[in-house]
């Protein structure tokens, strides 16, 4: 995927008034984020319903400056920026109307492997719940050892699922509600570091984004969207 497409995808996410579904619609209609900017003057003819206000907003130079800044951060920190047209982008998630235009990824797991399951649950996991999770993954490892385990690195069942996955030699992905410049909760850093060697960390949020409450709701659609079973 070209750097231009990465920059244009990141810039689109920062266009005032466009929103995620609006940006996804433009990229889907024209085939790429780059083409959205190349054809911005005639967007109202190419994509019905696009307002002049949005067309004017696409000239936002600050959006491009921030996009270039973020891509520099990614390059320095060995983070992959996966756009919708990137072959590494989760194909199941791409089918969703609210799919992120770009994902930030550190790790070595194939996000399009055949078997991907989601294990999530309460943040106040009981010993019984933890035991069920552990036994399930132990049994699964004998049947489908190449399964990718996805969760949210949160307290409770999430972190237990990641740790049980690592113990059973699964690759496991943590979908984060913040940028890749931090780990939240901080107590899970050791597990997160292990996951970078046996799975990875994934987010739609740029560096500097805090783990605010609304971001956890947004990230849940990614946890669900990349999985075959959940």
What label would you give each PLM region?
Residues 1-145:
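Short, positively charged patches
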């Amino acid at each position: 995927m070209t750097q231009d497409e990465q920059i244009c995808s990141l810039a689109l996410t920062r266009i005032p008034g466009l929103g995620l579904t609006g940006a996804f619609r433009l990229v889907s209609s024209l085939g790429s984020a780059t083409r959205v900017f190349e054809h911005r003057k005639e967007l109202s003819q190419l994509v019905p319903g696009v307002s002049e206000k949005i067309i004017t907003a696409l000239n936002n130079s600050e959006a491009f400056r921030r996009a270039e800044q973020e891509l520099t951060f990614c390059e320095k920190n060995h983070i992959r920026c996966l756009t919708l047209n990137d072959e590494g982008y989760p194909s199941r998630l791409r089918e969703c109307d609210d799919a992120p235009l770009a994902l930030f990824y550190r790790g070595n797991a194939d996000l399009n492997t055949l078997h991907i399951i989601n294990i999530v649950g309460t943040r106040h996991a009981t010993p019984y719940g933890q035991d069920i999770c552990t036994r399930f993954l132990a049994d699964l490892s004998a049947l489908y050892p190449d399964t990718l385990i996805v969760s949210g690195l949160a307290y409770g069942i999430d972190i237990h699922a990641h740790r049980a996955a690592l113990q059973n030699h699964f690759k496991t992905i943590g979908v984060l509600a913040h940028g890749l410049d931090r780990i939240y909760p901080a107590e899970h850093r050791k597990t997160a570091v292990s996951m970078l060697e046996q799975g990875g960390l994934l987010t739609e949020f740029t560096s500097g984004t805090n783990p605010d409450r609304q971001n956890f709701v947004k990230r849940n659609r990614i946890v669900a969207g990349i999985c075959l079973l959940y």
